[in-house]
UniProtKB/Swiss-Prot annotation:
Compositional bias annotation for Acidic residues: 25-34
Name of the protein: TBC1 domain family member 12
Region Disordered, residue ranges: 1-41, 119-138, 169-202, 219-290
Gene that this polypeptide is encoded by: tbc1d12
Task of the protein: May act as a GTPase-activating protein for Rab family protein(s).
GO molecular function: GTPase activator activity
Gene source species: Xenopus tropicalis
UniProt feature, compositional bias: Basic and acidic residues: 172-183, 240-250
Pfam families in the cross-refs: RabGAP-TBC
Keywords: Coiled coil, GTPase activation
Residues in coiled coil: 331-365
UniProt feature, compositional bias: Low complexity: 129-138
Organism lineage string: Eukaryota, Metazoa, Chordata, Craniata, Vertebrata
Keyword Hydrolase (UniProt): no
Annotated Rab-GAP TBC domain residues: 392-602
Length: 684
């Protein structure tokens, strides 16, 4: 122990060393006996007083002694303290000191307050070892003002010491009172019979050595509560804050066969082998198949829920309610697993279908490049080519086949395209310089002139395939699309620009070069059906709608009468499909396959595709009214697949009373002409 004047400095020394300035301690002790008694009494009073801080610990909780100087705890007090040792708080190293008979004439000053090496007491029998210890029960010793304190693992003893015991000290720190800091070769003295007789009125008591074995000087923490016993909901409601134990940052987690996680803190286990020995199972990583199975068939959103009791502020569940909730939870998990299994099977099926399509495309590309394209004029009308065409064109040769199928009846050359493009650029330049004047002119111009304006082209380009982000301003194909549409307005001022042309031009740009795309675009819009729609020829458009209704009634009579009951005419949904050639209504890859067969069969396939869409969603449309039907057909579902759609298209028969599409349309043209003649004759 360190005295009050040491200011925290160490006051213990190695065995056999002398304190500096005390080489003649024997002479000084004889001359200063009275001074030593006075200093000892003051130190005893210092220790026995409560609420006084020592340099090696706080003794605030020592039993309060007498008011007089030198008053010490009595034997009865010490017995009471030892009996109620659990109630005595020793927060940071304070020692419980019992009374002892101080040797007369002790003039050791502060030496008696230091940790000293024990020497044989007068009552120790000869031949006994002055210090004895056991390796299994490490002990330490310290003296406080003539009181020898023996710290053992099982009990705490107080022995008398002589003045000679203060001369031999061993090294130690005021905080290093733990057994593992005992100097090498030191042990505690054996108990002397004389001491036992003198202290016979004081029975042996269990002292504070038990506190040292409990890690007395370390910070005490509360025992962690089991998380499973704490009520609360993990996901819903307000949960009161729960006290959780501080976990080590390094946690060994083991995944057992039941899927639960067991964690072991690393300081508690020496190595993994010890953990395996305690748990009785080896630590093996889960196999790849097991891990994959868990990822595919265990829904994390439901199996991660932990069933707990209700919060403490709510009534507890009854047994019946607990069983019912458990059953409902198991049912939800089972349903979620079924959905996961179905989703995994669906993804697997789609992957197989995609692989099959890629293999078919690869084999078809070889046939097209080696057999069909070199002999196009001869092979294009054969049954083999038509069947291969129906399955879809490989993307690598799609643009070339489209160019050959559409043809170039207008005899447009790349040089002609450059001429019209330069004219369009001049118009853009003049439009930017006189923007206000052009706006005034557009306000008083005709409908065709307004649609041919560059402002309308700009607006429509920004709405072309917005999900691709390649045709908008700043995209890689923005200027290219703008050039083709501007050149076409200069090439066909009678048609100008109509909303929907940007989608057709964009699909061609994705599959052809710039000049070839413009040639195909101009020739495609020159077809009778597209020309009638883009020139907004109402009489021709009505004839196409009438021909469509003939085959509509032939193939889908129930849906046809359902549409007529709500007065739903074909123009409400066919105009958008024909203007954009299904590139806006269908997914892009599916629209390209529609374009493949459209290049083979012509305008007939456009109306056949419309009937295929109606057949695909016939059951849904029969349950809808006018508004919902129009909304549904304007924006078709995005999950439509090419196999289902083309299966429904193949089921549509484009024959009516042994008449094909062209024959029906021609007869309708004659009827309309005869009707026009009769109306004119009646007027005259």
């Amino acid at each position: 122990m360190v005295g009050p004047e040491d200011a925290g400095q160490g006051a213990v020394y190695r065995c056999g060393e002398e304190r500096h300035g005390l080489t003649d301690a024997a002479d000084e002790e004889e001359g200063e006996g009275e001074a030593g008694d006075r200093q000892t009494d003051i130190l005893q009073l210092y220790i026995s007083r409560p609420a006084i801080k020592m340099t090696n610990g706080d003794l605030n909780y020592l039993p309060q002694g007498g008011a007089g100087e030198g008053d010490m705890p009595s034997a009865g007090d010490m017995h009471s303290l030892s009996t109620h040792k659990e109630d005595i708080k020793q927060p940071n190293g304070g020692l419980l000191v019992a009374d002892s008979t101080r040797p007369q004439g002790c003039a050791c000053h502060r030496q008696c307050c230091s940790l000293s090496e024990a020497v044989p007491s007068p009552g120790t029998p000869p031949g006994s070892s002055p210090i004895s210890s056991s390796s299994s029960s490490p002990v330490s010793a310290r003296t406080v003002a003539g009181y020898f304190v023996s710290e053992e693992a099982d009990r705490f003893r107080f022995l008398d010491v002589s003045r000679q015991s203060c001369r031999n000290t061993f090294e130690g720190s005021r905080r290093q009172s733990a057994p593992d800091h005992l100097a090498d070769g030191l042990s505690l003295p054996a108990e002397s019979p004389g001491t036992a007789e003198q202290d016979g009125d004081r029975p042996w008591k269990v002292g504070i050595a038990e506190f040292f074995s409990r890690n007395f000087f370390s910070k005490r923490t509360k025992d962690p509560k089991s998380s499973s016993s704490v009520p609360g909901w993990k996901l819903f409601g307000k949960v009161p804050p729960r006290e959780t134990a501080q976990k080590d940052s390094k946690i060994i987690q083991q995944d057992d066969s039941s899927g639960s996680l067991s964690s072991v803190s690393t300081p508690n286990l020496l190595n993994t082998g010890e953990y395996e020995a305690r748990t009785g199972r080896s630590c093996k990583a889960p196999s790849q198949s097991t891990r994959k199975k868990k990822f595919e068939f265990e829904p994390l959103s439901t199996t991660a829920l932990i069933l707990e009791d209700r919060p403490s502020n709510l009534p507890a569940k009854s047994v019946h309610e607990t069983l019912r909730h458990r059953q409902e939870y198991d049912e939800m998990v089972a349903e979620a697993k079924k959905r996961e299994v179905k989703e995994a099977q669906r993804r697997k099926k789609l992957m197989k279908e995609r692989i099959r399509q890629e293999e078919n495309i690869a084999s078809a590309m070889v046939i097209w490049n080696t057999e069909i394209l070199p002999n196009w004029d001869v092979m294009r009308s054969t049954r083999r080519v038509r069947d291969l065409w129906w399955q879809g064109l490989p993307p690598s040769i799609r643009g070339k086949v489209w160019s050959l199928a559409i043809g170039n009846e207008l005899n447009i050359t790349p040089e002609l395209y450059e001429i019209f493009l330069s004219r369009a650029k001049e118009r853009w330049k003049s439009f930017s310089e006189t923007n206000s004047e052009n706006e005034n002119e557009d306000a008083g111009a005709s409908l065709a002139d307004r649609e041919a304006s560059l402002e309308l082209i700009k607006l429509d380009i920004s709405r072309t395939f917005p999900s691709l982000y390649i045709f908008q301003k700043g995209g890689p194909y923005h200027d290219l699309l703008h050039s083709i549409l501007g050149a076409y307005t200069c090439y066909r001022p009678d048609v100008g620009y109509v909303q929907g042309m940007s989608f057709i031009a964009a699909v061609l740009i994705l599959n052809l070069e710039e000049a070839d795309a413009f040639i195909a675009f101009a020739n495609l819009l020159n077809k009778p059906c597209q020309l009638a729609f883009f020139r907004v020829d109402h009489s021709m458009m009505l004839k196409y709608f009438a021909a469509f209704e003939v085959f509509f009634e032939e193939n889908l009579p129930k849906l046809f009468f359902h549409f007529n009951a709500y007065s739903l005419t074909p123009d409400l949904y066919l105009i958008d499909w024909i203007f954009t050639l299904y590139s806006k209504s269908l997914p892009l890859d599916l629209a390209c396959r529609v374009w493949d067969v459209f290049c083979r069969d012509g305008e007939e396939f456009l109306f056949r595709t419309a009937l295929g869409i109606l057949r695909l969603y016939e059951d849904i449309l029969l349950q809808m009214d006018f508004i919902h039907i129009a909304q549904f057909l304007t924006k078709l579902p995005e999950d439509i697949t090419s196999e289902k759609l083309f299966g429904c298209i193949a089921a549509i028969q484009m024959q009516n009373s042994n008449k094909k599409w062209t024959q029906v349309f021609t007869s309708l043209m004659k009827d309309y002409k005869e009707g026009d003649k009769m109306s004119q004759a009646s007027k005259t």
